[in-house]
Amino acid sequence: MPAPSAIYPSLNGKNVLITGGAEGIGAATVERFALQGCQVIILDIARDLAQKTIEHVMSLADKTGIWPSTIMAPVFYYCDVSNLSEVQTTTSEILRKYGTVHVLVNNAALTGHKARLSTEEVTSEAWDMNINTSLRHVFFLTQAVIPGMKHAGGGSIVNLGSITWRIPDPAVPVYGACKAAVMGLTRAQSKELGPFNIRINSVMPGAIATQRQRDEVLTPEYRAEVMRSQSLQRDLVPEDVAKVIVFLASDEASGITGSSYVVDGGWCSDP
């Protein structure tokens, strides 16, 4: 990969915590922050995929020509975000070791076939799994990093939403409800924490051609539906989303909070 398309000096040396950073949008975001000179911390359950992401990032260090001496290897912490106790224990360990988390990216969510359940198919167990994996940890990770951000004079939190609740997508009613709730959290907490210079924004991806989506969801029929719905006639890729996340975390976006940025190729056609 070439050097990042935009360099944000304000991010150099910052600690960035990314959930679900082993693959897909998360992995692309790990790469983008690492190339900005950040210490990236990955929370995920996919240890092997996380290691591949870390190795890939480090293979780029000599190819960018941008701050080669400050590209730090991302670090991985095994954490099942659906397990609140595990989230809290792991976060406490990270905060003890790294101090302040300057940027939090709440990306992890239940996706693929596990999230594609109709209303009649959703059991109480499936409901809890969706809520715990796609929503609950967003609140409690934010809660955990707030004290350090306040002490540091501010910080940035980027929550990953989705256009599924805006379309709306009847195939994922619980997932859509979780992502609508993420929007509500973003708006409420941005008001609550703005006085402390903590900015909270969300990014709402559309149909992003991650490897998991290609393997599980992006059939020729579904891709044809995506192309009919999008204005842009190309597959959107994880890097399209990652670039927006990094911008929102930087000081270039210092006046932006409580906002949602849609990356959907024109599917919704409004903010």
Regions found by a protein language model. Give the residues of each.
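Active-site loop-to-helix junction immediately N-terminal to the catalytic Tyr of the SDR YXXXK motif
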Residues: L117-S118, P168-G176, A188
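Active-site helix of classical SDR
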Residues: T142, C178, T186
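Residue(s) in the substrate-gating loop at a strand-loop-helix junction
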Residues: S162
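C-terminal substrate-recognition "lid" of short-chain dehydrogenase/reductases
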Residues: F139, K150, G154, R234-V263, ...
